Amino acid sequence: MLAFKSDFLNIMSERGFIHQISDEKGLDALFSKEVVSAYIGFDPTASSLHAGSLLQIMMLYWLQKTGHRPIVLMGGGTGLIGDPSFKDEARRLLTQDDIAANIADIKKVFARYLTFGERETDSCIVNNAEWLCTLNYLEFLRDIGKHFSVNRMLSFDSVRLRLEREHSLSFLEFNYMILQAYDFVELYKRYGLRMQMGGSDQWGNIINGIELGHRLGTPQLYALTSPLLTTSSGAKMGKSLNGAVWLNADMLSPYQFWQYWRNTEDADVTRFLKLYTPLPMDEILKLSALQGTEINEAKKILATEITAMLHGRDLANAVAETARKTFEERTLGENLPTFEINANDLKMGTGLLILLVQAGLSKSNSEARRHIQGGGVRVNDHIIEDETHLIREEDINAQGIIKLSFGKKKHVLIKPL
């Protein structure tokens, strides 16, 4: 890989964001001589992005920090189809109302990372439904479809692997890569965008856009993809044992978000500090030198910095303090997740097994049972080893709540109503 002249590509390289670039010399020269507008597309198939999207959001963050213009593309049009890249089956089709509602919720996250406005490097959020939903199908086939080879499209890994596993690929989904390529050209026409970024699974789709632009007479367009990250143990980023690590606070509490990053494996701490925080590299190198139990301090800094970017510094510090009190002082922190229960249920007693599942601490009764038998469940910091144990009114403490603990790191406050 080249030693880059431009600040943006230097940061991308130094921090580990780069998987592939379509033309390293050409892109570096472009970034060195002018303000570059670039974009990443986000799929609005849920009402929140999850932590797997943070890598791309940080790429946009650094793009703006180094004096360039990041564009957020919401797939309001392509979302009606769903990206088939490396999926074994078709996604559930959403309505336009579903997607519009999801986009409204997702937009809030980007304001934490990007500056929006009318200045040259200010960001904006664009919805590809603006042009895709008004296309004339016959004109599109004639003017755009003629530039795509089905033979070549079938050779892309995202399609080939699915067909080799004998999973069907609908004509609807097959059109996705054509629409994404068209997005790139349309965004150049409307906003002067010269580069698309994305995960490495999007390489084929982005290259399609570059080639379409060449055939339609645009200036040279560029691709930059990031690696598809997993943890050192092979787990997919953005997923936990309890499901997706959502970015919206109404879908995952800031405390749970902080805790996800606090539980980072030792081998991943330095890599994640580079990718997910704006900390200077010299500070990251100092933290990476920590060994043994000292690495836990680096994990706390990692969790707090990532949470601060998403939820604000004050709240990040508050949840870090909650964690400290919970784990080090065994007291109740203000930001622990809460689960509300009918107070009448406690008069007769509620089964501990059921409550562990309902409160989201355990995925199943059998998992809860194993933890109880192993001494891993506590009620108000007292170990409970009886799987038939009932939670009753007398368990309510002076603060009017009941603290449930599942293992060392998962806690919920039960609040009777």
From Swiss-Prot:
One example of a Gene Ontology biological process annotation: tyrosyl-tRNA aminoacylation
Molecular-function GO terms, alphabetical: ATP binding; RNA binding; tyrosine-tRNA ligase activity
Localization per record: Cytoplasm
E.C. no: 6.1.1.1
Assigned GO CC terms: cytosol
Residues given in the record as L-tyrosine binding sites: 39, 176, 180
Catalytic activity: tRNA(Tyr) + L-tyrosine + ATP = L-tyrosyl-tRNA(Tyr) + AMP + diphosphate + H(+)
Annotated positions binding ATP: 239
Superkingdom of the source species: Bacteria
Motif ('KMSKS' region): 236-240
Annotated keywords: Aminoacyl-tRNA synthetase, ATP-binding, Cytoplasm, Ligase, Nucleotide-binding, Protein biosynthesis, RNA-binding
Main location group: cytoplasm
UniProt motif ('HIGH' region) ranges: 44-53
SUPFAM superfamilies: Alpha-L RNA-binding motif, Nucleotidylyl transferase
Domain called S4 RNA-binding: residue spans: 350-417
Family: Belongs to the class-I aminoacyl-tRNA synthetase family. TyrS type 1 subfamily.
Function: Catalyzes the attachment of tyrosine to tRNA(Tyr) in a two-step reaction: tyrosine is first activated by ATP to form Tyr-AMP and then transferred to the acceptor end of tRNA(Tyr).
Subunit text: Homodimer.
Listed name of the protein: Tyrosine--tRNA ligase
Organism of this sequence: Bartonella henselae (strain ATCC 49882 / DSM 28221 / CCUG 30454 / Houston 1) (Rochalimaea henselae)
